[in-house]
Structures are given as C-alpha cells and as structure tokens.
Swiss-Prot record:
Protein name: Pimeloyl-[acyl-carrier protein] methyl ester esterase
GO BP term, example: biotin biosynthetic process
GO MF: pimelyl-[acyl-carrier protein] methyl ester esterase activity
Family classification: Belongs to the AB hydrolase superfamily. Carboxylesterase BioH family.
Function: The physiological role of BioH is to remove the methyl group introduced by BioC when the pimeloyl moiety is complete. It allows to synthesize pimeloyl-ACP via the fatty acid synthetic pathway through the hydrolysis of the ester bonds of pimeloyl-ACP esters.
Chief location: cytoplasm
GO cellular component: a single term: cytoplasm
Gene name of this polypeptide: bioH
The organism of origin for this protein: Pseudoalteromonas atlantica (strain T6c / ATCC BAA-1087)
Top-level taxon in the UniProt lineage: Bacteria
Pathway annotation: Cofactor biosynthesis; biotin biosynthesis
Length: 258
C-alpha cells in the first residue's frame, strides 16, 4: 500500500488533474492556474519525491508505482493532464484506471522519450550525463535541464525565470527521485500499450522542442486511432503553457471535455 500523496484542489466544475514534469513541482502550473480554476475543479499533484511529496518515495521508484500513487488520489471521472515526465505518468494512470480517466491531455510528452531505431527522441548520452551531474551539483543540473526545455523559444530566458520562480515556494525534489525519474525517461516505452486506450487523447506539442521532437505528430496520426488529436505550437519549445500561455489556454479550452 502506497503512502497517500498530498494534493491541492481549487475551483469548481468537472475534475481536472495536473501532473508536472521532471525537476519541478506543481507550482509550475501557475501561469494557467487561475483560468483553469474558473472552469474546472483543478487538482494539483506533486509527484512522489517532488515538492510537498518529497518525503514519499515508493520502492522501487518506477513508473508503475508512480502511476499507482497518482491513481490513489485521482478524483472520479477526471480529465488528466501531464507535462513531460508527468505525461508519461498520466499515460500509465490511464492504463491502470481507464474508466476513471475521462480524457488525457498530453503536453510535450511522449510514450518513449529516448531516441531509438526510427524513433526521434533524446540522445541516451544526455540523460546519462544528467544522472552523473546530479550527484555533483543538484541545483546546477536542474538549471541546465530547464535551459534545454526552453531552448528554441524566443522567450527562453524569461521562460526559465518563470519556471524557477513558480517552483521556488515548494520544497526541493529528493535526489533519489530525480535520478529515478531520469531512469524512467531513459527506459520506458509505452507505445504498444497506449494504442489500446479508448478515451479521447489530445497531444499538445512545441515545434521547437528538443526533448520531444515534433515528429511525434506523424506517429500519433499514422499509428494511433481516431481518439487521438494533436496541436502543434509553431513557436514553442518544451513548455508551451509558459512561453505561449494564451494560445495554449485557447487550445486547451477548445479541446477539453466538459
């Protein structure tokens, strides 16, 4: 039995759950929070080892256990949105709880992050280098990761500052969770499993994203069923909800089930 995660719910309306990415916490959703809370009952979740849940470390710290921890606090009939690593967790939660996830919103995420044969993704050397650097200098490594996330965006410096400011109020992530999170990004491949998901799934990708290449759009349209839709933000990198908040919210509102 997993320790219950702390969550925060604000607003009223249909249930909408947000899962953040690697190295940050639920504070990262600040730019879109007020708007969402006007239309939905929004639940903010810090993943195990991050933010307010930085003392909770499931053993082993793997995708299945992360998804189970989130599934335990998932309100019924939820729209589940995940960014980056959080999107990978969201996909696994939907596999565990298909009747409880009304819709998946997948933001700058992928069923497989690492580059492979005929698959665009992150070079494995980059993820391994981050793991090694974490031990030497935690805060500098997270800063470097944030810089890669913003790379390509016209407002890269502002984006990085916004992310840093939004996550500073919460406790720092546990180094073991950060290391295990990189391991998940390096090794997990959910391509076969997500093809079986039946709920509506909306992907939101940045054309300039160096972590989740926009080629993913071709895979979604070619290999996945008609319950999947994709929006590409032409000038965004890995954090479209920060760099292009207005466009992001318009698309999110248009494509989210009520």
């Amino acid at each position: 039995m997993h320790t219950t995660l702390k969550t925060r719910t604000v607003g009223s309306g249909p249930n909408f759950v947000l899962l953040h990415g690697w190295g940050v916490n639920s504070g990262v959703w600040q730019p879109i929070a007020k708007q969402l809370e006007q239309h939905f009952s929004v639940t903010y979740v810090d993943l195990p080892g991050f933010g307010e849940n930085n003392q909770i470390m499931p053993k082993p710290y793997d995708l299945k256990n992360l998804a189970e921890c989130v599934a335990n606090v998932l309100p019924e009939n939820s729209v589940l949105a995940g960014w980056s690593l959080g999107g990978l967790v969201a996909q696994h939660v939907a596999l565990l709880e298909p009747t409880n996830v009304k819709q998946l919103i997948l933001i700058a995420t992928s069923p497989k992050f690492q580059k492979g044969n005929d698959w665009a993704g992150i070079d494995p050397n980059i993820l391994q280098a981050f793991s090694q650097q974490l031990v030497k200098n935690l805060s500098k490594t997270i800063e470097r990761f944030l810089a890669i996330q913003a790379m390509g965006s016209d407002s890269a410096k502002t984006d990085i500052r916004k992310i840093k400011n939004s996550i500073e109020a919460s406790p720092q992530a546990d180094i073991a969770a950060l290391t295990a999170g990189l391991d998940i990004l390096e090794h997990v491949d959910l391509r076969d499993q997500i093809a079986a998901l039946k709920m509506p799934i909306h992907w939101m990708l940045g054309r300039l994203d160096s972590l989740v290449p926009v080629k993913l759009q071709g895979y979604v349209q070619r290999s996945l069923a008609k319950n999947h839709s994709v929006t590409i933000f032409p000038h965004a990198s890995h954090a479209p909800f920060i760099s292009h908040t207005e466009d992001f919210l318009i698309d999110l509102m248009e494509n989210t089930l009520r």
